[in-house]
């Protein structure tokens, strides 16, 4: 779905779930939001629940049209947002991951089989600073830490 000429929605819809966070009724299901920003550098914003990895990767691939993403920005490590990180990095192994220090700590804990086998070279990850900026070209991503708004590693990007 096109948000603008440079921003594309690549998320997926889960019509099977009836409770969000195990307690809030969602009679129409819910969305796992993910976006691609197409610029001189390409950023993919977040991943999706593991049950939807294949559909999401297909959405990403379609939007990229043969290009390789430069960045994968991970704003939150709860599994419904992060479960597709290993599959994404297997498909796009040269992509640089951007997250908080705590986010990277969680990645190592959640995906030890992936990070222990393949690792993530220092040049392939960026610890986003609070109030930090990542330049994509005409677009700039600004990072704001929001620990404990939901989980301890959360950051927002605008």
List each model region and its residues:
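Metallo-beta-lactamase
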Residues: 2-5, 99-154
